[in-house]
């Protein structure tokens, strides 16, 4: 046995030679689309012909400048397969301002692109590079957005029980709604166009009346009355309430038996989150708004979360999202990747969910999956019976389609 092992080791190329075989970063492109003005795609071209694809979300012009004015100087000419080294180099500049914002979104997109390129060159799906498959498919829950062919938010408002039954029969794990956003202080009028999140942003609310509490609760009660225990209900809070109102909401939710409440208060205080966990019996999911493992460490150290939510496109790419998921596992907690944004993030989430044993499920907006995702990608996500199937192509398993890139409303910028 040892003779055979030694023979293979001697026959294998040196590590430095294998690294060269993966190529170097030759060019970096960013792609923006006027029809989805909050998305940015990053394409990393390598010297061996691979084109890795990444993505991030929100104020893409700022992220684009970070990529071309900062990251390109650090990445061009560097080994494309040395992902950890490139991540560390980029993070050393990003964390100069507190490792968040446009810098971290740029790092996230580029990191995912490097993983995609590595999978293409090595001929394996990204989940294999992350440790291999723990499952063959992942169950999804649907976030109820009006998008594409589906008007799920309108449906949730008008008849939440009917929507819950429909999604249950389609195989989904559950549905996520945000019943109390409309009662929080508003930055702009609902329905206003502008940066993503405007309709769910605003000053933190310090008072929710009993009547408004009951009004929001009725959406979930009507759904639960219709579907009983056969389907999960999830609540999104968008961090709109102070800790006292968060406690009030969560206590009211206890009889409904939701799978979790997500970001009902700001996630920047581990002490507040600890109070929420101790004073209510509703599972708390924390938080797509936490950036990097260092922010998650404080929450977990305080035992202030039941489920860890990670956004691959914001928190540092696949590299950092896997670190956070592994950190959650040391506390025996499940994790769930966040995505209400774009198709590449959905793909990256899928690979991480396939590889990570403590994944509870993935988020999708079915109107996006059945809508514009199909226009952007050359290979659509396979969502059937409420589950996303294991990808079988190298890398992430999809690229931006040639027809999409040729559209007049698509803008490309190149650094090389």
Task: Enumerate the predicted regions with their spans.
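Metal- or metallocofactor-binding catalytic centers and their adjacent structured scaffolds
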Residues: 47-122
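Proline-centered loop/turn at the N-terminus of a beta-strand
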Residues: 125, 139, 232, 283, ...
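Metal-dependent enolase-superfamily TIM-barrel catalytic cores that perform enediolate-based chemistry
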Residues: 137, 142-274, 279
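Conserved, mostly hydrophobic/aromatic
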Residues: 49, 71, 110, 123, ...
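C-terminal extensions of enzymes
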Residues: 3-4, 371, 377-416
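Structured beta-strand/loop patches that form or line metal/cofactor-binding pockets in enzymes
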Residues: 9-57, 367-374
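Shared catalytic-loop signature of beta/alpha-barrel
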Residues: 65, 85, 251, 257-260, ...
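N-terminal export signals
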Residues: 1-11
């Amino acid at each position: 046995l040892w003779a055979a092992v030694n023979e293979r080791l001697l026959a294998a190329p040196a590590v430095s030679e294998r690294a060269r075989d993966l190529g170097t970063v030759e060019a970096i492109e960013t792609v923006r689309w006027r029809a989805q003005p909050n998305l940015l795609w990053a394409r990393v071209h390598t010297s061996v012909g691979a084109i890795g694809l990444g993505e991030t979300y929100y104020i893409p012009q700022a992220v684009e400048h970070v990529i071309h004015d900062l990251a390109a100087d650090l990445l061009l000419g560097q080994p494309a397969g040395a992902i950890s080294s490139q991540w560390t180099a980029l993070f050393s500049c990003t964390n100069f301002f507190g490792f968040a914002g446009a810098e971290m979104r740029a790092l996230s997109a580029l990191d995912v692109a490097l993983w995609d390129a590595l999978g293409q060159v090595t001929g394996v799906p990204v989940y294999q590079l992350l440790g291999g498959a723990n499952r063959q498919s992942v169950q999804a829950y649907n976030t109820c957005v009006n998008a594409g062919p589906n008007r799920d938010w309108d449906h949730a408002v008008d008849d939440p029980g009917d929507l819950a039954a429909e999604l249950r029969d389609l195989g989904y794990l559950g549905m996520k709604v945000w019943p109390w956003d409309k009662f929080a202080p508003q930055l702009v009028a609902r329905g206003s166009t502008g940066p993503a999140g405007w309709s769910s942003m605003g000053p933190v609310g310090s008072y929710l009346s009993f009547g408004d509490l009951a009004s929001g609760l009725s959406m979930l009660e009507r759904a639960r009355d219709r579907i009983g225990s056969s389907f999960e209900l999830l609540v999104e809070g968008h961090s709109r309430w102070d800790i006292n109102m968060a406690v009030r909401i969560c206590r009211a939710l206890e009889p409904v038996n939701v799978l979790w409440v997500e970001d009902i208060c700001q996630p920047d205080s581990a002490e507040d989150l600890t109070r929420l966990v101790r004073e209510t019996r509703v599972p708390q999911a924390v938080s797509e708004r936490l950036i990097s493992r260092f922010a998650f460490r404080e929450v977990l150290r305080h035992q202030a979360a039941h489920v860890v939510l990670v956004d691959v496109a914001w928190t540092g790419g696949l590299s950092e999202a896997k670190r956070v998921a592994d950190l959650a596992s040391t506390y025996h907690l499940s994790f769930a990747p966040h995505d209400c944004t774009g198709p590449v993030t959905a793909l990256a989430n899928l690979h991480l969910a396939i590889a990570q044993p403590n994944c509870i499920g993935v988020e999708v907006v079915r109107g996006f999956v059945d809508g514009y995702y199909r226009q952007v990608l050359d290979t659509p996500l396979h969502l059937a019976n409420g589950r996303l199937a294991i990808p079988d192509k190298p890398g992430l398993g999809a690229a931006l389609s040639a027809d999409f890139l040729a559209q007049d409303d698509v803008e490309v910028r190149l650094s090389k």
